[in-house]
């Protein structure tokens, strides 16, 4: 990498890097995109499960949302390359350190490509 490229790289904002990551994920060849809804049961609310899921999803480069449900469960809707989505599903089986996951249900849905980020959803909407 040349000096000019390094200098440009250092000047890039996180949002630009994030946008490049989004494009990279969407452009991956030979990857099948899937959509999975995940329901996580156990001690999963009040233990930073949503924020930890958002961080893990962003790290993996998958898109969708995570939210608490009124019944004490956490729901995740995720889209992206199959291998990366499967890695997030596997992560949900243990979650963050304070969580105690007892059961994970997953159901595959038709991929829509509607998301361009991964967000924490709250009662008032996505944040």
PLM region spans:
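Intrinsically disordered, low-complexity, mixed-charge
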Residues: 2-127
